[in-house]
Swiss-Prot record:
A molecular-function term among this protein's GO annotations: metal ion binding
GO cellular component: mitochondrial inner membrane; respiratory chain complex III
Additional note from the record: Heme 1 (or BL or b562) is low-potential and absorbs at about 562 nm, and heme 2 (or BH or b566) is high-potential and absorbs at about 566 nm.
Gene name linked to the record: MT-CYB
Entry's localization field: Mitochondrion inner membrane
Function: Component of the ubiquinol-cytochrome c reductase complex (complex III or cytochrome b-c1 complex) that is part of the mitochondrial respiratory chain. The b-c1 complex mediates electron transfer from ubiquinol to cytochrome c. Contributes to the generation of a proton gradient across the mitochondrial membrane that is then used for ATP synthesis.
Protein name: Cytochrome b
Cofactor binding comment, as recorded: Binds 2 heme b groups non-covalently.
Binding positions (heme b b562): 83, 182
């Protein structure tokens, strides 16, 4: 008798995706982040559901309802901080996952890559709206500043901003709709993840060498299920250490002050995972130019397949491109640091130079170095 997992319509899908999936035998720990992102999404949806049971999306009570969750709900503090720090873990895994894709040339799978970029934008939108919900000072002013950027769009800008706000400023209507969107988007993300995996399983996984691995595939279970489980243990260990020892390490103290439209905080800044894009936005003096630079700082990932001039897919055997990749990583860390600093000398010029370097590396230096490496290898 054939095994039920190979015949039952539902079990068959699970079997082909997680059990009998042919996987390259040489994929490293950098390939763990997909499953870790799935785990993060699961944690966020579960903790978020329990938070939503006690949260009220009204400007008068939102801040107090979060305080109530932390003080009066059983393990409410744990759920709240797991959700807040879970978002940070989510973005750490996302950045490493995207970085892996760039390093090993996984962007050659264009459908998977483009769905991934849509996922990145959706997760960023969800995180931004989630940050507004506690209705602290940084929530209110962050929402005001970021939504206001849309007013830079010619002709329809102002109307668009007021339409999003549901009035003439960030208020009750804005908070209510942000809560509604923040609740629904993770389920849309889950659906997009299915599409992401669907396209990935059409081609099979890439591997560190960037070569075709059809001749050396092994079943996903038990080899990679056990490997993913180790990654999951590490993820949960780091997350719980953060939650239980220093839950406010990555947060902003200003968000413990209830939102006050009459008092502007000295430094308005988003959560740490948006700081690199925020630094790029601030480094351009023109409003529309800044908004375009902000969008293109992530959308630039979509043109990576067009900038691939190397005869080798992966950077594993390309020392010049490797060097450039790590300079880009350092540059992104610099931008993250600058995004959290006040707008004054020398931070302004450092931010501008780091922004120029970011776009130059991706648009000019990567293609140049690829061609140079081809020449050095007489290809």
């Amino acid at each position: 008798m054939t095994n039920i997992r190979k015949t039952h319509p539902l079990m068959k899908i699970i079997n082909h995706s997680f059990i009998d999936l042919p996987t390259p035998s040489n994929i490293s720990a950098w390939w763990n982040f997909g499953s870790l992102l799935g785990a993060c999404l699961g944690i966020q949806i579960i903790t978020g559901l329990f938070l939503a049971m006690h949260y009220t999306s009204d400007t008068a009570t939102a801040f107090s309802s979060v305080t109530h969750i932390c003080r009066d709900v059983n393990y409410g503090w744990l759920i709240r901080y797991m959700h807040a720090n879970g978002a940070s873990m989510f973005f750490i895994c996302l950045f490493l996952h995207v970085g892996r894709g760039v390093y090993y040339g996984s962007y050659s799978y264009t459908e998977t890559w483009n769905i991934g970029i849509i996922l990145l934008f959706t997760v960023m939108a969800t995180a931004f709206m989630g940050y507004v919900l506690p209705w602290g000072q940084m929530s209110f002013w962050g929402a005001t500043v970021i939504t206001n950027l849309l007013s830079a769009i010619p002709y329809i800008g102002t109307t668009l901003v007021e339409w999003i706000w549901g009035g003439f400023s960030v208020d009750k209507a804005t908070l209510t709709r942000f809560f509604a969107f923040h609740f629904i988007l993770p389920f849309i993300i889950a659906a997009l993840v299915m599409v992401h995996l669907l396209f990935l399983h059409e081609t099979g996984s890439n591997n560190p060498s960037g070569l075709n691995s059809d001749s050396d595939k092994i079943p996903f279970h038990p080899y990679f299920t056990i490997k993913d489980f180790l990654g999951l243990l590490l993820l949960i260990s780091i997350l719980m250490s953060l939650v239980l020892f220093s839950p406010d390490l990555l947060g902003d103290p200003d968000n413990y002050t209830p939102a006050n439209p009459l008092s502007t905080p000295p430094h308005i800044k988003p959560e740490w995972y948006f700081l690199f894009a925020y630094a790029i936005l601030r480094s351009i003096p023109n409003k529309l130019g800044g908004v375009l630079a902000l969008v293109f700082s992530i959308l630039i990932l979509a043109i990576l397949p067009l900038l691939q001039f190397s005869k080798q897919r992966s950077m594993m055997f390309r020392p010049l491109s490797q060097c450039l990749f790590w300079i880009l990583t350092a540059d992104l860390l610099t931008l993250t640091w600058i995004g959290g600093q006040p707008v004054e000398h020398p931070f302004i010029i450092i931010g501008q130079l780091a922004s120029i370097l970011y776009f130059s590396i991706i648009l000019i230096l990567f293609p140049m170095f690829s061609l140079l490496e081809n020449k050095l290898l007489k290809w």
